[in-house]
Swiss-Prot record:
Source organism (scientific name): Bordetella avium (strain 197N)
Pfam families per UniProt: NAD_Gly3P_dh_C (PF07479), NAD_Gly3P_dh_N (PF01210)
HAMAP family reported in the protein's UniProt record: NAD_Glyc3P_dehydrog
Source taxonomy: Bacteria, Pseudomonadati, Pseudomonadota, Betaproteobacteria, Burkholderiales
Enzymatic reactions: sn-glycerol 3-phosphate + NAD(+) = dihydroxyacetone phosphate + NADH + H(+); sn-glycerol 3-phosphate + NADP(+) = dihydroxyacetone phosphate + NADPH + H(+)
Residues reported to bind sn-glycerol 3-phosphate: K122, G153, S155, K208, D261, S271, R272, N273
Protein name as it appears in the record: Glycerol-3-phosphate dehydrogenase [NAD(P)+]
Family listed: Belongs to the NAD-dependent glycerol-3-phosphate dehydrogenase family.
Functional summary from the UniProt entry: Catalyzes the reduction of the glycolytic intermediate dihydroxyacetone phosphate (DHAP) to sn-glycerol 3-phosphate (G3P), the key precursor for phospholipid synthesis.
UniProt cross-references to InterPro entries, sorted A to Z: 6-PGluconate_DH-like_C_sf, 6PGD_dom2, G3P_DH_NAD-dep, G3P_DH_NAD-dep_C, G3P_DH_NAD-dep_N, NAD(P)-bd_dom_sf
Length: 354
């Protein structure tokens, strides 16, 4: 059973992007927390300004939050009791392999290999089309004693950093990961739910970004809210089909990390994926949008998701349409017409079978 009355934890958040910073801010309101940045200049700026001026400008960070650019210092901050420590990874998918290899090397030297580790990245690895848990397994294998999981859900970093309400899901096969994350974050403005469905939680977080790009394109074309609702609903079916083929549970996609995250990312004004889609629908070129500094995980992982699905024999028509528009020069309205021209089919439980 999950409980929230555990003694104070010591928490190291590795990665000072928007989401790592937001979670560090939330955790530091309850427990001693250190945020690790890759560069000394960024760590110094965070410490002096008490603000992440690059990723979360205008959001004041709690006075108790500490900063460092030294990974050894960040791990030493955890102390010597792995049962009273937690590592939160705020690095992107592309950085997962290297940071896990570092932890697999450094934690045993401190007698801290049992420290719970949870990652927060969403998406597929570009070259391999692997989900984060698959990257971890390939990097460190079943390292004796290491307990890992994923933290995900419908959340914009800025709102979490500001202390606004949010509900998240932690998924792991290890109960101590679920206990640690719940103790670290649950309470006040953050509600934490537990799951054991790691692939399902990761799939929801990955594919919702692609579907959000599609919804943005639809909105940019002024196709109306009916069209957006159709894309969200059919996108959920797409996500579920794909997830089942990777061993996920269907009911996971009706929860926070499936439907919840999809609705937020497809409709929210802070959604970068939706924003890219809006610009595409309005006629701008992808290269111009990306050159302006906008980043969107849905753009980065769309082709990897489609390739992985094809290898499993899973049909992803919306994802395929997004790839055609983003990378093959297909006009947005042409892609919409192709989706509308697909054969009629029955909706229901058979619709999501892999």
């Amino acid at each position: 059973m999950v409980t929230t009355n555990a003694p104070s934890l010591r928490i190291a958040v590795l990665g000072a992007g928007s989401w790592g910073t937001a979670l560090a801010a939330a955790a530091s309101r309850r427990h001693p927390t250190l945020l690790w940045a890759r560069g000394a200049a960024q760590a110094a700026s965070l410490s002096i300004e008490r603000e992440n001026t690059r990723y979360l400008p205008g959001v004041a960070l709690p006075a108790a939050l500490r900063f460092s650019a030294d990974l050894d210092q960040a791990l030493d901050f955890l102390g010597t009791d792995p049962d009273q420590a937690l590592i939160i990874l705020g690095v992107p998918v592309a950085g997962m392999s290297s940071i896990m290899a570092e932890l697999a090397l450094r934690l045993p030297l401190r007698g801290m290999i049992r420290t719970p580790i949870v990652w927060t990245c969403k998406g597929f690895e570009t070259d391999s089309a692997r989900l984060p848990h698959e990257i971890v397994h390939a990097s460190v294998g079943e390292l004796a004693g290491m307990a890992c999981g994923v933290l995900s859900g419908p959340s914009f970093a800025r709102e979490v950093a500001q202390g606004l309400p949010v509900a998240l899901t932690v998924a792991s096969r290890h109960e101590r990961v679920i206990r640690a994350v719940t103790a670290a974050l649950h309470g006040a403005a953050v509600r934490v739910y537990a799951s054991q469905d790691v692939p399902g939680v990761e799939m929801g977080g990955a594919l919702k970004n692609v579907i959000a790009v599609a919804c943005g394109i639809s909105d940019g074309l002024a196709l109306g809210t009916n069209a957006r609702a159709a894309l969200i609903t059919r996108g959920l079916a797409e996500m579920t089909r794909f997830g089942l083929a990777l061993g996920a549970r269907a009911d996971t996609f009706a929860g926070l990390t499936g439907l919840g995250d999809l609705v937020l990312t497809a409709t929210g004004e802070l959604s970068r994926n939706r924003r890219v889609g809006l610009e595409i629908g309005a006629g701008r070129k992808l290269d111009d949008i990306l050159a302006s500094g906008v980043t969107a995980e849905g753009v980065r992982c769309a082709r990897a998701a489609l390739a992985r699905a094809h290898s499993l024999g899973v049909e992803l028509p919306i994802t395929e349409a997004v790839c055609a528009v983003l990378f093959e020069g297909v006009a947005p309205m042409t892609a919409v017409s192709a989706l509308l021209a697909r054969e009629a089919r029955q909706e229901g439980s058979t619709d999501v079978q892999p």
